[in-house]
UniProtKB/Swiss-Prot annotation:
UniProt entry keywords in alphabetical sequence: Ribonucleoprotein, Ribosomal protein
Protein name, UniProt field: Large ribosomal subunit protein bL32
InterPro entries attached to this UniProt entry: Ribosomal_bL32 (IPR002677), Ribosomal_bL32_bact (IPR044957), Ribosomal_zn-bd (IPR011332)
NCBIfam families for the chain: rpmF_bact
Amino acid sequence: MGVPKRRTSKARKNKRRSIWGQMAAPTLVECPQCHQLKLNHRVCPKCGYYKGREAIQVAE
């Protein structure tokens, strides 16, 4: 089994772990049908439209 040859320094360890604090929030866009915020390239959960046509039936 592999064993580290040298001890990992605090700086190297912290650099590797630093990405967790920089994760970006998901991009939200306005639905052209109902003007609610939705995820990009996804069906709108509020009205069920995607690219100008109804993709799913939404119970109201």
